[in-house]
């Protein structure tokens, strides 16, 4: 079993009767995830976009197997588009009682949807959320070239509310004829609008997804904005709101300098010119590939699975936690400052020097494709190398 990293101590605070613990290192996230499953006594619910049958996947597989042998009910949902691991890999666990479902896109509107959510829940008592998947590259270190990401452990009454959402989503996933209208109903029924901790969701709804509406609404009154966005290609309306904060207060964005999809970097850079003009500070994270999804708006935090891009805003099934708490926001601003210190400041002069006409054309084309097509398509086209 992997050991928790000693370089990043757990950061933990209580908010509205729930214990929130931030996990910043890949190895400590994997250790915490395995412990969550091993400590379960009644139920384990897992939901991931990617599940790869590598070393990390095997460790989680074995933890699920141990849970099943203890008599724990175990459920696993993965996405067909994101997870290439064949169903046969999980067959021995299914034979032992695993409830296994795969989000299958079909032709029509449902084909466009990805189940991009990530969570691991035990006993309706504790849940781990974040942007990471089940794959070695999400649990390593910067020296390994692993993704930089975040995990958040939530322990308390908020977990039971999320469990009911999971069960409704699992029922819809197992129904191959499930209607988009039914899915919309699930998203809106479980989306929360009150309290210090609010579960907010995304999906194929009309207009912005509920989580995106909450974020956009919070932006309107914000004076101090900090965003870490691995894939940054939002709507022009959201870009304008960020720009207004840049003019009247302070707005800072950390985007990726490294990725496995160069088109997403180019698409983000396409937005820089207008943001820099409005006083927004932009940084690119240097140590390794960036996968973090974090928004800090004054004393409000949005953290979870969704990128600030068109798919995350309108289409993908996403899960975010909105946290309204000054102490927790202060802790997250401290984390943000640490990431800024490891990032390259993008000045207007630097952006101009590295943005010739051909580069600008590639950026515009990448922005168009990222906001209209699937990431897999842009990754295969490899447009963003420049």
Report residues per predicted region:
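Charged, low-complexity intrinsically disordered terminal segments
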Residues: 1-386
């Amino acid at each position: 079993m992997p050991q928790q990293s000693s370089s990043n101590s757990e950061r933990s605070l209580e908010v509205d009767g729930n214990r929130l613990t931030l996990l910043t290192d890949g190895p400590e996230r994997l250790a915490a995830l395995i412990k969550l499953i091993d400590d379960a006594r009644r139920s384990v619910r897992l939901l991931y976009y990617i599940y790869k049958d590598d070393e990390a996947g095997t460790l989680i597989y074995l933890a699920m197997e141990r849970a099943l042998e203890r008599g724990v009910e175990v459920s696993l949902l993965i996405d067909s588009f994101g997870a290439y691991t064949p169903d046969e890999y999980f067959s021995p666990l299914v034979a032992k009682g695993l409830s296994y479902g795969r989000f299958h896109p079909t032709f029509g509107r449902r084909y466009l949807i990805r189940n991009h959510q990530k969570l691991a829940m035990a006993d309706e008592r504790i849940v781990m959320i974040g942007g990471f998947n089940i794959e070695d590259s999400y649990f390593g270190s910067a020296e390994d070239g692993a993704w930089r990401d975040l995990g958040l452990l939530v322990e308390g009454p908020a977990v039971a509310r999320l469990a009911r959402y999971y069960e409704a989503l699992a029922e819809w996933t197992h129904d191959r004829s499930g209607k988009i209208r039914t899915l919309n109903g699930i998203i809106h029924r479980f989306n929360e609008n009150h309290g210090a901790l609010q579960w907010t969701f995304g999906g194929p709804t009309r207009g912005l997804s509920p989580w995106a509406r909450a974020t956009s609404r919070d932006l309107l009154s914000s004076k101090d904005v900090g965003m870490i966005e691995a894939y940054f290609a939002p709507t022009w309306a959201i870009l304008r709101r960020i720009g207004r904060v840049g003019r009247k207060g302070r707005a800072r964005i950390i985007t990726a300098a490294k990725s496995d999809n160069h088109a997403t970097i180019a698409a983000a850079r396409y937005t820089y010119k207008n943001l820099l003009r409005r006083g927004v500070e932009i940084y690119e994270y240097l140590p390794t590939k960036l996968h973090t999804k974090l928004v800090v708006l004054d004393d409000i935090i949005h953290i979870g699975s969704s990128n600030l891009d068109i798919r995350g805003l309108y289409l993908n099934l996403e899960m975010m936690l909105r946290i309204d708490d000054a102490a927790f926001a202060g802790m997250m601003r401290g984390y943000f400052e640490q990431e800024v210190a490891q990032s390259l400041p993008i000045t207007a002069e630097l952006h101009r020097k590295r943005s010739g006409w051909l580069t600008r054309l590639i950026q515009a084309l990448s922005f168009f494709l990222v906001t209209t097509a699937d990431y897999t398509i842009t990754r295969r086209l490899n447009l963003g190398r420049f």
